[in-house]
């Protein structure tokens, strides 16, 4: 019951502000860092549609390759339950797409020479 009165927005004025006609509300003391800022445009947002088309094409190719290899495995071995069926209508979130995009870039670049195997101390 006491919480409802605490939720009211209070205005505070000192003598100088009262003379100038300026009143502050709660939250005015915070600087610009807390105000809403526009979203910065980053690389993957600029080429989003183009990149998504490339990724979708690559994913489709991989699904087709996977489907053909899965059917070959199934006909050769005839072991049910060990071969996963491809999902044609799989939903992939943006974060997953970004992860796989970064993974593809890392694979294309080659081996990372600052790996855990080497002691760099």
Curated annotation (Swiss-Prot):
Ranges that cross the membrane: none
Keywords, ordered alphabetically: Phosphoprotein
Pfam families according to UniProt: DUF4612
Phosphoserine sites (modified residues): 95, 115
Entry protein name: Uncharacterized protein C1orf21 homolog
Spans annotated as Disordered: 1-28, 60-81
Coiled coil segments of this chain: none
């Amino acid at each position: 019951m006491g919480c409802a009165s605490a939720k009211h927005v209070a205005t505070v004025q000192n003598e100088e502000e009262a003379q100038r006609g300026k009143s502050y509300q709660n939250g005015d003391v915070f600087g610009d860092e807390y105000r809403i800022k526009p979203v910065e445009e980053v690389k993957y947002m600029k080429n989003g549609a183009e990149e998504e088309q490339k990724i979708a094409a690559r994913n489709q190719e991989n699904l087709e390759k996977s489907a053909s290899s899965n059917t070959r495995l199934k006909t050769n071995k005839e072991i049910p339950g060990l071969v996963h069926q491809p999902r044609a209508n799989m939903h992939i979130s943006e974060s997953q797409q970004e992860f796989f995009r970064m993974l593809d870039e890392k694979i294309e670049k080659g081996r990372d020479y600052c790996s855990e195997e080497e002691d760099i101390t």
